[in-house]
């Protein structure tokens, strides 16, 4: 009896089930206050779900728990309570392109590294995947593959970080402040690279940032964090135009109280009722 190729069915099921579930997650760290040991809660009862195709942004001021939450989602640290379920492959781009790349590895070796966690890939396929990832971030493999990170600019290093994240063809791309250490011109270039990759690969995006403009330009849905808690969640138009929490109102007002800002982020400002 001959069986039909069911690859298309398998891929369809995968696309429908790829998701990240964060359920009632809490995380504490040891600290010292007034000379006494104490526990500080970095993440406070956080729950959300990212489905296939979602573009999520987690925004908030520095120290609100965003990066800790991202590290929990990635499995780099364990929550003290709560559950994180991950269905699908995850690529990660760290905040610091200078610290996140091994100084003694070439660009090709760095980008190739995640492939060793997948099932066996032959040499020619490995080269193809690495070259495709480098081309996707506009780094010519012939020019850059054998360079060390010390021979790259900050923008080029972050492109290598992105190439390393996408070489496995991830279902989810998690990015922690991916442009915070780059100047404005390079930041825009990286935005454009990320946007094209997310659309082309049809992967979901989880972006951790305090850059309100970036979250508006890159994400469809926003979670607002304050002191480890999610204080507001919704579509970006809702969060920008109809805030329910005082902290969100303060955060958005501070960011948008600049001439031309609404045009910059591509969102129509709601009319203020007299």
What role is predicted for each listed range?
Residues 173-176:
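Catalytic Walker B motif of ABC-type/P-loop ATPase nucleotide-binding domains
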Residues 215-217:
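A short, surface-exposed alpha-helical micro-motif characterized by mixed small hydrophobic
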Residues 233-234:
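ABC ATPase "signature
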